[in-house]
Amino acid sequence: MSIREWFEDRRKITGLLKNSVERDSKDVNEMERNKNLSIDYVKINRLWVQCDNCESLLYIRFLRENKSVCEECGYYLQMNSSDRIELLIDRGTRHPMDEDMYTLDVLQFHSENEPAHSDPLHSEDESYKDHITFCQIETGLTDAIQTGIGQLNGLPIALGVMDFKFMGGSMGSVVGEKITRLIERATEESLPVIMVCASGGARMQEGSFSSMQMAKIASALYIPQKDNRLLYVSILTSPTTGGVTASFGMLGDIIIAEPKAYIAFAGKIVIDQTLGQKVIEDFQVTEHLFGHGLFDLIVPRNLLKCVLSELFYVLQSSS
């Protein structure tokens, strides 16, 4: 090999290396750009929410100030239990109850030997225990309800608030026990009970243990209500369905519903298939049900605290 040929070979190798380095640099830069875009998307996702009805982008800070009601179309977005408590309870007056109570997988729903999945919410095979753990991490709650004692415009009350973000607000053993204890304490201390319902119904992973909570809560309410020792106000939000609707959701001395809330026992598709005929649209929406006498009041979210305090003052003065 001559010296000229050797230099030509070195030039070719150098050119190939240079092209390879340039391609690698472009790939790295592209990855960095995609990473930045991903970070920006996460930041944006924490600052903005899209309305489920009109698809408008809503700034979270303003949305919370507006009680999670869309500024564009007036649609009621879901509120978590902590925001509901902040809406109703005077600041600094709340004393939570049974925060350390958590669910046990008594039925061992799905074997622990089955393969795990990365996203429990999108896997029907995920164990119940893993699903509960996932929801606890996501929401910061031990189960689908928060209970406690507090003051509403200076009036002491007992409050239970269900959280739909925790397994669809489903009612299991812990939810039933916490509600029962809240009712018993309210009866002992002569406090009115407010229950904010947001649930898909009984929790299927607990089988009959879940269904039993319907009877247990109804029994806890029956005697105090019959003897006029307990005022129970049920607030139905969207969605309230299944076993919750069939039990304590509809047992209130006063039943209040939010505007345009979805309230039902069985879903529309199930009813269509069972009856073999089409049912009318929006027959499970607040306004239609109110027209047929299922509720006492429809109260906008921003007026709820004032309306409740007025009701309690009137009832206390008349008793």
From Swiss-Prot:
Query: Which domain of life, per UniProt?
Result: Eukaryota
Q: Main localization of the protein? A: plastid
Metabolic or biological pathway, per its Swiss-Prot or TrEMBL entry: Lipid metabolism; malonyl-CoA biosynthesis; malonyl-CoA from acetyl-CoA: step 1/1
Q: What is its EC number?
A: 2.1.3.15
Q: Name a biological process GO annotation.
A: malonyl-CoA biosynthetic process
GO molecular function term, any single one: acetyl-CoA carboxylase activity
Cofactor(s) recorded for this entry are: Zn(2+)
State whether keyword Chloroplast applies.
yes
Which Gene3D superfamilies has this protein been placed in? 2-enoyl-CoA Hydratase, Chain A, domain 1
**According to its record, what are the GO cellular component terms?**
acetyl-CoA carboxylase complex; chloroplast stroma
**Zinc fingers (C4-type) span which residues?**
51-73
Which UniProt keywords are listed? Answer: ATP-binding, Chloroplast, Fatty acid biosynthesis, Fatty acid metabolism, Lipid biosynthesis, Lipid metabolism, Metal-binding, Nucleotide-binding, Plastid, Transferase, Zinc, Zinc-finger
**Catalytic activity entry:** N(6)-carboxybiotinyl-L-lysyl-[protein] + acetyl-CoA = N(6)-biotinyl-L-lysyl-[protein] + malonyl-CoA
For the ligand (Zn(2+)), the binding residues are: 51, 54, 70, 73
Q: Name one Pfam family in it.
A: Carboxyl_trans
CoA carboxyltransferase N-terminal domain spans which residues? 47-319
| Protein location | Plastid, Chloroplast stroma
The record's free-text note on cofactor binding: Binds 1 zinc ion per subunit.
Query: What family, per the record?
Result: Belongs to the AccD/PCCB family.
Q: What does this protein do?
A: Component of the acetyl coenzyme A carboxylase (ACC) complex. Biotin carboxylase (BC) catalyzes the carboxylation of biotin on its carrier protein (BCCP) and then the CO(2) group is transferred by the transcarboxylase to acetyl-CoA to form malonyl-CoA.
**Subunit architecture:** Acetyl-CoA carboxylase is a heterohexamer composed of biotin carboxyl carrier protein, biotin carboxylase and 2 subunits each of ACCase subunit alpha and ACCase plastid-coded subunit beta (accD).
Q: Which HAMAP family match?
A: AcetylCoA_CT_beta (MF_01395)
PANTHER family, per this entry? ACETYL-COENZYME A CARBOXYLASE CARBOXYL TRANSFERASE SUBUNIT BETA, CHLOROPLASTIC (PTHR42995:SF5)
Q: What is this protein called?
A: Acetyl-coenzyme A carboxylase carboxyl transferase subunit beta, chloroplastic
Which species does this protein come from?
Answer: Picea abies (Norway spruce)
Q: Which gene encodes it?
A: accD
